[in-house]
């Protein structure tokens, strides 16, 4: 995986709190085990007026022409609550989301997002309110998420955020659990070479 250092992108404002993982990716789309192909089902029950996903809901913010191609999602508190399905961050990443900004995220969703190389940024409710006002008032508004500096930049302002240093290291270097394990490949090989034959 390539690392995440800084990203500037178009922002889609999803003005809803307590968005759960069943809304992010409904249960009928969970049969696959590959991470690919879930983006077309992202927020399916909100984005579409039919089960087949052929009639876009014109009232849903992500269908608005001005937000097409958005790579940063702005949301309200407790984003990603509900079941722990990893398909939720898979769907967001496959859709093209690189970073999410909200006052809070559900704990398991937060970790799963980082494992899938998306940056979940926690700002205060007041700061998130300011960003909503900026994005909604300015078509084409972009926000910069700088993981190296731990800053969000928008409308000439900077907002500081925090992230656990280990998770930040993983994001900066594009490391998931497998990548972390492979960093110790030489030690693993050494251990395996010294396993007694009766244990192999």
UniProtKB/Swiss-Prot annotation:
Gene3D superfamilies per UniProt: Aconitase, domain 4
MF annotations from Gene Ontology: 3-isopropylmalate dehydratase activity
Family: Belongs to the LeuD family. LeuD type 1 subfamily.
Keyword vocabulary terms for this entry: Amino-acid biosynthesis, Branched-chain amino acid biosynthesis, Leucine biosynthesis, Lyase
Enzyme nomenclature, EC number: 4.2.1.33
Oligomeric form and interacting partners: Heterodimer of LeuC and LeuD.
Signal peptide from the UniProt entry: none
NCBIfam families membership: leuD, PRK01641.1
Catalytic activity: (2R,3S)-3-isopropylmalate = (2S)-2-isopropylmalate
GO biological process: L-leucine biosynthetic process
One Pfam family in the UniProt entry: Aconitase_C
Encoding gene, per UniProt annotation: leuD
Pathway assignment: Amino-acid biosynthesis; L-leucine biosynthesis; L-leucine from 3-methyl-2-oxobutanoate: step 2/4
Protein's name in the database: 3-isopropylmalate dehydratase small subunit
Function summary: Catalyzes the isomerization between 2-isopropylmalate and 3-isopropylmalate, via the formation of 2-isopropylmaleate.
Domain of life the protein comes from: Bacteria
GO cellular component term of the entry, any: 3-isopropylmalate dehydratase complex
